[in-house]
């Protein structure tokens, strides 16, 4: 790996660190909102002495319904964050390839073709159901996990505050699993897109007569 290639790789690593920090902010906000919402609902005096299982189930549903907006914001936030990162990964890979060429004495630059970006980000995606839908699966998992944790908490006699803390901050928190999966998707797709962008650039350079040596 030559100096130019190392610089390009470092730029991509910096972008990866940035998206991980942004995802952490998105998830921390969601966890805090979740914890606060459960604690607010638990403070309602008309729901202090729930005895009936039916009422408990209704309360669980009320909790989950109240968290719908928070989960929607989480879905939208992580999708936007990762989508922006993947587009930047394409730019890094494409521009980086020509930067590498210039470092070897070939002063060639070809503008990025938007249809190639769309193809790399969507058509050639390795995700089975698309980025938005794939991330939505984790949000759906979060919703089911929150409901299950509320059921376990009621059965074991936990307080609502204890349940809120387990859901938001426990080592096995559903938020942690979804967060880790979002990072995995960003990393694997970002790497694939960067490589595909470099190949697109190489094909374009070859058409212009550049002698490309396979890296």
Predicted regions and their residues:
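Acidic, glycine-rich two-metal-ion catalytic cores of nucleic acid-processing enzymes
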Residues: 164, 175-215
């Amino acid at each position: 790996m030559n100096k130019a290639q190392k610089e390009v790789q470092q730029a991509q690593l910096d972008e990866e660190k940035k998206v991980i920090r942004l995802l952490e902010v998105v998830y921390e906000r969601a966890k805090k909102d979740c914890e606060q919402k459960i604690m607010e609902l638990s403070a309602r005096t008309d729901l202090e002495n729930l005895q009936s299982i039916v009422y408990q189930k209704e309360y669980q549903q009320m909790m989950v319904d109240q968290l719908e907006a928070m989960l929607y914001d989480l879905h939208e936030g992580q999708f936007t964050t990762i989508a922006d990162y993947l587009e930047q990964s394409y730019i890094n890979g494409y521009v980086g390839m020509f930067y590498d060429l210039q470092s070897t004495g070939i002063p060639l630059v070809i503008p990025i073709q938007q249809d190639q970006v769309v193809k790399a980000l969507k058509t050639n995606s390795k995700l089975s159901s698309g980025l938005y839908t794939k991330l939505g699966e984790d949000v759906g998992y979060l919703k089911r996990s929150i409901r299950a944790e509320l059921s376990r908490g009621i059965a074991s006699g936990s307080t609502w505050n204890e349940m809120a803390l387990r859901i938001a901050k426990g080592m096995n928190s559903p938020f942690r699993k979804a967060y880790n999966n979002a990072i995995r998707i960003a990393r694997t797709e970002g790497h694939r897109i960067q490589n595909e962008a470099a190949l697109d650039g190489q094909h374009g350079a070859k058409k212009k007569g550049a002698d490309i040596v396979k890296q």
